[in-house]
A protein has these predicted regions:
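Small-residue-enriched hydrophobic alpha-helices in membranes
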Residues: 2-38, 43-204
Length: 204
C-alpha cells in the first residue's frame, strides 16, 4: 500500500511517474534485485554495469542504500526471497519485472538461464505465470521490432498484448524504464505509443 502522500500525488497511468517519489527502502530493494539479475550470469557485462549505475543515480538512493546495491555485485549474501516478498506487497511488482527483464537484456541477449532466474523472482512477487510469459514475449518482440522498418504482425501482437496486460494490472511506467533496451529511439516510440494506448482506453 502506498504512503498517503504518494497516493494523493499519483498521476494518470498514461504519464511517466518518477520512481524517486517512492519510499527509499522500496527503491533500495528494487535495485538490489536488479543488481542480482545483472550478476546472475558468470560475468557482468559492461552495458549492464552502465545501466545499473545510471539507475542508481535516477533512483536517488541514500549513500548506504547505494552501497547495499553495489555490494550485490560483489556477491555479498542476499536474502532475495525476503526482499521479493516485501516488494510483492507494493504496487511496483510489474514495473520491477519490466526493469529486471530490461537488465537481463542489456547485453543484447536474454539467455535461458536468465529467464529461469527471472521466473523464480516472478513467483515470489506473485506474478501470474501467464503474465510473465506475456512480458517475456514483449521484451523479445520490442528488441526484434526495433531492427525493422515494418515489424512483423507477431511482434505487433505481442506488444499490444503486453500493453493490454499493463493496463489491466495498473502498471505505471517510469522515465528510467527501458521498454526496448537495444534502441533508445524505439524505446521512446513505445512509451509514446503506451501513453496513446492508455488515453484511448480511458476515453472509451
Amino acid at each position: 500500500m502506498l504512503p498517503t502522500n504518494m497516493a494523493t500525488n499519483m498521476t494518470d497511468m498514461g504519464t511517466l511517474t518518477e520512481i524517486s517519489d517512492y519510499p527509499w527502502r522500496w527503491r533500495r530493494d528494487y535495485l538490489m534485485l536488479v543488481a542480482a539479475v545483472a550478476v546472475s550470469e558468470e560475468e557482468l557485462h559492461p552495458d549492464e554495469m552502465e545501466l545499473l549505475k545510471r539507475w542508481v543515480e535516477q533512483f536517488r538512493l541514500p549513500p548506504k542504500s547505494r552501497e547495499a546495491v553495489f555490494a550485490v555485485l560483489k556477491n555479498k549474501p542476499l536474502d532475495r526471497p525476503r526482499i521479493e516478498r516485501r516488494l510483492s506487497r507494493t504496487d511496483l511488482v510489474y514495473s520491477l519485472m519490466l526493469d529486471l527483464m530490461g537488465m537481463a537484456m542489456a547485453d543484447g541477449i536474454l539467455m535461458d538461464k536468465e529467464i529461469h532466474f527471472l521466473r523464480g523472482i516472478a513467483e515470489n512477487l506473485e506474478i501470474d505465470p501467464i503474465d510473465f510469459n506475456i512480458l517475456i514475449e514483449f521484451i523479445h518482440s520490442a528488441h526484434q521490432a526495433a531492427q525493422m522498418d515494418n515489424p512483423e504482425p507477431l511482434y505487433e501482437h505481442n506488444i499490444e498484448s503486453a500493453f493490454q496486460l499493463m493496463l489491466k494490472r495498473n502498471v505505471r511506467l517510469f522515465p528510467h524504464t527501458l521498454l526496448c533496451v537495444s534502441s533508445p529511439e524505439y524505446d521512446l516510440q513505445l512509451k509514446e505509443r503506451w501513453m496513446r494506448f492508455v488515453a484511448r482506453n480511458n476515453n472509451r
